[in-house]
Amino acid sequence: MVDPIVTKNWRDLIKPRGLVVDQESLSNTYGKFVAEPLERGFGITLGNSLRRVLLSSLQGAAITSVKIEGVEHEFMTIPEVAEDVTDIILNLKEVLLQIHTNEVKTLRIEADGPREIKAGDIIADGQVEILNPGHHILTISEGGRVRMEMTARRGRGYVPADKNKVPGQPIGTIPIDALFSPIRKVNYQVTNARVGQQTDYDKLSLEVWTDGSVAPNDAVAYAAKIVKEQLSIFINFDEAEEPAEEVKPVEEQKLNENLFRSVDELELSVRSANCLQNANIKTIGDLVQKTEAEMLKTKNFGRKSLKEIKEILAEMGLSLGMKLENWPPKAAPQGAPKV
């Protein structure tokens, strides 16, 4: 059994209320995520760890070699084709793939001119998905003919061309350096967060750009899982034997006194105030239990009002989507208005 005194090493640390996703800017290639409050210093610790893992350790798919009929090496040209082989290889490196298997897949292009060949013209089986079918690969003139075979697979990080050489490949097979990572860029910023009257906590803002083969929110989840799995070996006790955390009744918990204030004190715009009144939201405690989705369903309540309320709540160390058990409590803090 883990000593209850020892568990205070991690149980006494403040934990984020949850991960907030910026729904306005969220897309299949970009996401902004905010976690607060964090203990001082944890913003940089977590932000830097997640950034490094996102950029280096997530799996993706890429073309790793190509064999073109009539071509022996990458410095040759193909009759009646506008691009030389070097340019074609550069274009192949930018083809975005999803491969739903761990097997090496064979892709083909078989075309006669005149025509433009795009990524969508690649012949593949049902386990391979081309994510940018409009991407240009080459242009064939009248009388031209192209037959090429490529290999593609899943991998991690950047792999140079010489590492993609496979013994026994046919003569004329050209290995390609592959960038498997689905992550294009990661930024993070650490600012101050407020908890009650204290402002010496961290707020972590994380921005993630992907190639579209993985959703930004999934990418962050995968990176966090990798970090968690790697750190688990350092825990030298059985977490199952850890004593259950004592849950105090709501009356005994120290509630943020702002929860008992009327929403009229928030000095909101007329539109936002009217929306809260129509939704029968009287106190800040009532308000913070609403999710963003629930608020947006309120009549005449839009994104501008949502942003206004989120900013005001953040200044109080509060946010939408909080869970307050048995609200309102039987006894309000001394000096707080009755609800």
UniProtKB/Swiss-Prot annotation:
| GO MF annotation list | DNA binding; DNA-directed RNA polymerase activity; protein dimerization activity
Catalysis performed (reactions): RNA(n) + a ribonucleoside 5'-triphosphate = RNA(n+1) + diphosphate
Identify the GO cellular component terms for this protein.
Answer: cytoplasm; DNA-directed RNA polymerase complex
UniProt enzyme class: transferase
- Return the annotated region ranges for Alpha C-terminal domain (alpha-CTD): 255-339
EC numbers listed for it are: 2.7.7.6
Question: By its UniProt entry, which InterPro entries does this protein fall under?
Answer: DNA-dir_RNA_pol_insert, DNA-dir_RNA_pol_RpoA/D/Rpb3, DNA-dir_RpoA, RBP11-like, RNAP_asu_C, RNApol_insert_sf
A Pfam family of the record is RNA_pol_L
Q: Which GO terms describe its biological process?
A: DNA-templated transcription
Q: Does the keyword Hydrolase apply?
A: no
Domain of life according to the entry:
Bacteria
The record's keywords, sorted A to Z, are: DNA-directed RNA polymerase, Nucleotidyltransferase, Transcription, Transferase
**Region Alpha N-terminal domain (alpha-NTD): which residues?**
1-238
- Please verify whether the record's keywords include Cell wall biogenesis/degradation: no
Which family is this protein grouped under? Belongs to the RNA polymerase alpha chain family.
Question: What role is this protein assigned?
Answer: DNA-dependent RNA polymerase catalyzes the transcription of DNA into RNA using the four ribonucleoside triphosphates as substrates.
Q: What is known of its domains?
A: The N-terminal domain is essential for RNAP assembly and basal transcription, whereas the C-terminal domain is involved in interaction with transcriptional regulators and with upstream promoter elements.
Q: Which HAMAP family match?
A: RNApol_bact_RpoA
Assembly and partners?
A: Homodimer. The RNAP catalytic core consists of 2 alpha, 1 beta, 1 beta' and 1 omega subunit. When a sigma factor is associated with the core the holoenzyme is formed, which can initiate transcription.
Q: What is this protein called?
A: DNA-directed RNA polymerase subunit alpha
Q: From which source organism is this entry? A: Anaeromyxobacter sp. (strain Fw109-5)
Upper lineage is: Bacteria, Pseudomonadati, Myxococcota, Myxococcia, Myxococcales
